[in-house]
Amino acid sequence: MPGDDDVPRPTFNATRAVTVVARPEQIWPWLIQIGVGRAGWYSYDWLDNLGRHSAERIIPEFQHLAVGDVMPMSPDGKHGNVVKAVEPNRWMLWGDQAGQATWYWGLYPADERHTRLITRVRMRYRWTSPLALFNPLVEFTDIAMMRKCLLGIKRRAEASTRCRHRTGRDVVSHLSG
């Protein structure tokens, strides 16, 4: 997958996936607006988003993503991942500034109505860092947090798709304006 060569011998490697009843272009708007100070993580808001609810609508100002953009990972914006590559409606790759971690998000059409949403995190722990004790916590919480995040994206994308089919209107433009 994109980014695998950037972290060739990761200490932590986790690939998660969910099938979404929607096309990649219907999922993409939810995916690229993800993050702190953006639409949230669609996960446990009390933990991931400091109690602020994740968005239930497409937010127009977060619909453009370019290589070099920083995806904040902390509320103060001091920690973040840089967008390393992006293929709209297909995939995006983030990486940390130290070159020790990548986070990949991909959309793979399964058939005319279904898409596999896949995310992969690869990182090399820095055991000499003052944050070294945080590393085991990442492994312990990652599966629950990512499951909730993926299911949150799935729920939103499928609801938008159902609404679009029911009303015949483009939900993205309806919700954003």
Predicted regions and their residues:
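Acidic, Ser/Thr-rich low-complexity intrinsically disordered segments
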Residues: 171-177
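Short glycine-enriched loop/turn motifs at secondary-structure junctions
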Residues: 9-14
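Glycine-rich portal/gate segments that line the openings of hydrophobic small-molecule binding cavities
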Residues: 1-8, 19-21, 25, 32-104, ...
